[in-house]
Design a protein with these regions (language model features):
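Glycine-rich beta-strand-centered segment in the early N-terminal region that forms part
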Residues: 26-53, 62-110
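Short structural boundary motif marking the start of a folded domain
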Residues: 2-7, 45
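Generic structural detector for well-ordered beta-strands
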Residues: 19-24
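Active-site/binding-pocket entry motifs
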Residues: 14, 53-55, 126
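NAD(P)H dinucleotide-binding glycine-rich loop of Rossmann-like/cofactor-binding domains
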Residues: 106-130
């Protein structure tokens, strides 16, 4: 898909806009194998991004104040239209517009169980980015 573009981190002070493949509604094979799971993603959705934000963490990576793997996609504060959904997604439908929280909450800690995912005790197990 020629219009599926992302901003990719190339190194301190360097980013590029690149075309990428349209995503599949599945867990990448290498991740599924490493985690001992199937590639099926019944709880997932695919969004067509309608707006994104340049976050401070993106700027820190680009300016060399923090590290980032070369090739990482930037932009993790997004709003998008649901274009595809897994068969176990219950409260979101194709065509819905939704915003994605900037943090990756664990869903298991005390705060998450109290629906305070914005202050998850185990937030962002990896790093910011898509």
């Amino acid at each position: 898909m020629a219009d599926n573009r992302v901003v990719v981190y190339k190194g301190p002070g360097e980013v590029a806009v690149e075309d990428i493949e349209y995503p599949k509604l599945e867990v990448p094979e290498e991740v599924a194998s490493a985690m001992g799971m199937t590639v099926e993603a019944p709880h997932a959705v695919i969004l067509r991004i309608v707006a994104t934000n340049i976050c401070g963490s993106d700027q820190h990576m680009v300016r060399g104040r923090t590290t980032a793997p070369v090739g990482q996609t930037l932009g993790h504060e997004i709003t998008g239209e649901v274009v595809e959904k897994g068969n176990d997604v219950q409260f979101i439908d194709v065509g819905d517009i939704c915003s994605v929280p900037f943090n990756i909450a664990c869903g298991r800690c005390r705060n998450c169980k109290e629906r305070k995912t914005g202050v998850c005790l185990n937030v962002n197990p990896a790093r910011a980015g898509s």
